[in-house]
Swiss-Prot record:
<feature type="binding site">
    <location>
        <position position="60"/>
    </location>
    <ligand>
        <name>Mg(2+)</name>
    </ligand>
</feature>
<dbReference type="GO" id="GO:0046872">
    <property type="term" value="F:metal ion binding"/>
</dbReference>
<dbReference type="InterPro" id="IPR027417">
    <property type="entry name" value="P-loop_NTPase"/>
</dbReference>
<keyword id="KW-0547">Nucleotide-binding</keyword>
<dbReference type="InterPro" id="IPR006073">
    <property type="entry name" value="GTP-bd"/>
</dbReference>
<dbReference type="InterPro" id="IPR030393">
    <property type="entry name" value="G_ENGB_dom"/>
</dbReference>
<feature type="binding site">
    <location>
        <begin position="31"/>
        <end position="38"/>
    </location>
    <ligand>
        <name>GTP</name>
    </ligand>
</feature>
<keyword id="KW-0460">Magnesium</keyword>
<dbReference type="InterPro" id="IPR019987">
    <property type="entry name" value="GTP-bd_ribosome_bio_YsxC"/>
</dbReference>
<keyword id="KW-0132">Cell division</keyword>
<feature type="binding site">
    <location>
        <begin position="58"/>
        <end position="62"/>
    </location>
    <ligand>
        <name>GTP</name>
    </ligand>
</feature>
<dbReference type="GO" id="GO:0005829">
    <property type="term" value="C:cytosol"/>
</dbReference>
<keyword id="KW-0342">GTP-binding</keyword>
<dbReference type="GO" id="GO:0005525">
    <property type="term" value="F:GTP binding"/>
</dbReference>
<keyword id="KW-0717">Septation</keyword>
<dbReference type="GO" id="GO:0000917">
    <property type="term" value="P:division septum assembly"/>
</dbReference>
<comment type="similarity">
    <text>Belongs to the TRAFAC class TrmE-Era-EngA-EngB-Septin-like GTPase superfamily. EngB GTPase family.</text>
</comment>
Length: 201
């Protein structure tokens, strides 16, 4: 487990002009609106309300930067897949993502958060393919596992792997921000990402 000595919100940004100048590796979180990215961050760092959670899908249309241990960063990306917003907002979201993924040099990996209860949406599939095509490492976390019985996990994880074309050897972390399920595994995966950065330096 990673020891979280310090965690703080840095800033929100809508384009590269607002990106903070942070050293060290950066890990982004992507997922549909209300899939639980903020809850995942809060549980990971063991802080209840550092990352703001919301009940309105599509409300947070900014990149939120969080600094961990003064060494590396989480970036909570705006949620996708919301239906009740204008085409202009959707277009702005696409532009925001393209700029971030192409210009953020210290991005090391993306944690893609999906809801274990549902087959990944078209938007989930498009995001996963987009990241893979760019050569960005993707770690899939299937959250809200407490909402279904343990006996159903295997079937649902298989559906997720099939929809996202994830090979059998690639790990999908079963996760619940409510119970803490999967937190040690996520810590281990993040630690591995960070250690790879240390090896390169």
């Amino acid at each position: 487990m990673i020891t979280i000595r310090k965690a703080e919100f840095v800033t929100s940004a809508v384009n590269i002009k607002g990106y903070p100048e942070l050293t060290g590796p950066e890990i982004a979180l992507a997922g549909r609106s209300n899939v639980g990215k903020s809850s995942l961050i809060n549980k990971f760092i063991n802080r209840r309300n550092l990352a703001r959670t919301g009940n309105t899908p599509g409300k947070t249309q900014m990149l939120n930067f969080y600094r961990i241990n003064d060494q590396w960063s989480f970036v909570d990306l705006p949620g996708y897949g919301y239906a009740k917003v204008s085409k202009e907002i959707k277009a702005n979201w696409g532009k925001m993502m393209e700029e971030y993924f192409s210009r953020r040099e210290n991005l090391r990996a993306v944690i893609q958060v999906v809801d274990i209860r549902h087959v990944p949406s078209v938007e989930d599939q498009e995001m996963h393919a987009f990241l893979r095509n760019r050569g960005i490492p993707v770690l899939v976390v299937a959250t809200k596992a407490d909402k279904i019985s343990k006996g159903q996990w295997g079937k649902h994880l298989s559906q997720i792997a099939k929809a996202l074309h994830i090979p059998d050897w690639h790990i999908i972390i079963t996760y619940s921000a409510e119970t803490g399920l999967g937190v040690p595994e996520l810590h281990e995966a993040v630690e591995e990402i960070l250690s790879m950065d240390n090896e390169d330096s």
